[in-house]
């Protein structure tokens, strides 16, 4: 496994690297939501106060294509501290997918981004897909209320006819705002393989199960709060 020093590159070094979307309006590197370092190779050097900037990792996996861009990164779970001194899962983590549209050659509008949070089960569906399989997921924040159907999100993953990759599409219908947004990002077999492998690695972490195998005492005992701050952007904030 990579050493911590290789994982925590200074942010200014990242910004000097050229990306396919380097001219992007609101580049992913400048606007990506911070992911609190939680993987076992990083956590031991993370500052206990999650409100500080030390210990955050900027590491989305991004794919820039002609009509839209897509990035994926884990959002770690949050925990409540128990009076006994242990911690209990408060909210499970997710793999957050972010889509934003193209507004010109190598230009993308970050302000019009849409989010889709993959649960652990949905991640399992994605990583188990074969070359001819397809998956579709539906999210509705008001599904069990009288407002059901006002805002709907659907994510579909379908294979190319020639087997060279997949089309990942997000549709967001907001009847309150009278909007209907759709993004489609073609990904190659190699790009999908990266996502599948990364998601498989991240799965136990977003479930919080890594706490069973790696529980450094300082990460719990020094926490000043009963609730670990939730450093994730909620899917339905948009």
UniProtKB/Swiss-Prot annotation:
Which terms are listed as keywords in the entry?
Answer: DNA damage, DNA repair, DNA-binding, Mitochondrion, Transit peptide
Pfam families assigned: Whirly
Identify the domain of life.
Eukaryota
State its location(s): Mitochondrion
> Which molecular-function annotations from GO does this UniProt entry contain?
DNA binding; single-stranded DNA binding
List GO BP terms, alphabetically: defense response; DNA repair; regulation of DNA-templated transcription
Residue interval of the organelle targeting sequence: 1-44
Region feature (Required for ssDNA binding): 65-70
Chief localization: mitochondrion
Q: One GO term of the cellular component aspect?
A: mitochondrion
Q: What does this protein do?
A: Single-stranded DNA-binding protein that may be involved in the maintenance of mitochondrial genome stability by preventing break-induced DNA rearrangements.
Q: Which family does it belong to?
A: Belongs to the Whirly family.
State how it assembles.
Homotetramer. Assembles into hexamers of homotetramers upon binding long DNA.
Q: Mind telling me what this protein is named?
A: Single-stranded DNA-binding protein WHY2, mitochondrial
Q: Which gene encodes it?
A: WHY2
